[in-house]
Amino acid sequence: MPVKKKRKAPGVAAAVAEDAGLKKCKISSYCRSQPPARLISGEEDFSRKKCLAWFYEYAGPDEVVGPEGMEKFCEDIGVEPENIIMLVLAWKLEAESMGFFTKEEWLKGMTSLQCDCTEKLQSRFDFLRSQLNDISSFKNIYRYAFDFARDKDQRSLDIDTAKSMLALLLGRTWPLFSVFYQYLEQSKYRVMNKDQWYNVLEFSRTVHADLSNYDEDGAWPVLLDEFVEWQKIRQTS
C-alpha cells in the first residue's frame, strides 16, 4: 500500500513486465526477507489493551497512523508499503484513505484478525494472501481499491493512480494487462470512473486474450470498446 503524504495521489510506480516502451515495475508482490516470526500459541488470547498500545507505537497526536507511522509499521512487519498485502490489510481494516489508519479502523480490523502485535500479524500473512485467490474476496478487494486510492474530493481516479493500482491488482494475472497499460499510456483518458474500473475486472475475467469473444454490442464502457478497436488495428498492421 503506497505511503501517501498529505493525501495526494500515491507515487506508486507502474508495474509492467518487460513490454517494450513500458516502465520497469517497482511494485513488489512479495515481502522483504525477514527473520522467522516468533511462533504464536493458539491459546494466547487477543488483548484489546495490547492492540491499542501497539497502535500508539505508530500513531501521531491526532490518533491516526499517518505516512511516517505507516512507513515504520511496514518496516517492523517486514513488508514494503507498495506490497499488495498492505492493500489486503487495509481492506480488512476497512481503511478509508490510503496511507492512513485511524484508531477505530485499527481496533476493529485487528480485532477481526485477532492480532495485537507484530508477530501475530506476520503469522496471518498467508491468510491475507489467500484472499487474493478467492474469486469473491478478490472482487471485493478490487472494488474497495477504487475508493481507497481515490482523492476524496474527486469522484474518479486520476489515470496514473488507476494504472498503478491496476498493475498491483492485475499485472501478474491478466495476460492483456501490459497491452491495456500501453493503451492507457497513449489514450486521451485522464481519469477512470467507477463504472470503467469495475468493468476492467469483468473484461479481464471474461474476454479472451485474442479478443475473439468480445461482444461489440455488449454493455461495455466506451473506454473498453476503444481499447479493443485499438488492439485489433495493431494486430492487423
From Swiss-Prot:
Keywords of the record: Cytoplasm, Cytoskeleton, Nucleus, Phosphoprotein
Pfam families the UniProt entry points to: Cullin_binding
Cross-referenced Gene3D superfamilies: Cullin, PONY binding domain (1.10.238.200), EF-hand (1.10.238.10)
Occurrences of domain DCUN1 (ranges): 46-232
Record localization: Nucleus; Cytoplasm, Cytoskeleton, Spindle
Modified residues (Phosphoserine): 41
GO biological process: DNA damage response; positive regulation of protein neddylation; protein neddylation; regulation of cell growth; regulation of protein neddylation
InterPro entries: DCN-prot, DCN1-like_PONY, PONY_dom
Modification comment: Phosphorylation at Ser-41 is independent of cullin's interaction. Phosphorylated in response to both TICAM1 and MYD88 dependent Toll-like receptor (TLR) pathway activation. Phosphorylated in response to IL1B stimulation.
Function: Contributes to the neddylation of all cullins by transferring NEDD8 from N-terminally acetylated NEDD8-conjugating E2s enzyme to different cullin C-terminal domain-RBX complexes which is necessary for the activation of cullin-RING E3 ubiquitin ligases (CRLs). May play a role in DNA damage response and may participate in cell proliferation and anchorage-independent cell growth.
Domain remarks: The DCUN1 domain, also known as PONY domain, mediates the interaction with different cullins. The DCUN1 domain mediates the interaction with the N-terminally acetylated NEDD8-conjugating E2s enzyme leading to the NEDD8 transfer from N-terminally acetylated NEDD8-conjugating E2s enzyme to different cullin C-terminal domain-RBX complexes; the neddylation efficiency correlates with the DCUN1D5-cullin and DCUN1D5-E2 interaction affinities.
Protein's name in the database: DCN1-like protein 5
Species of the source: Rattus norvegicus (Rat)
Chain's gene name: Dcun1d5
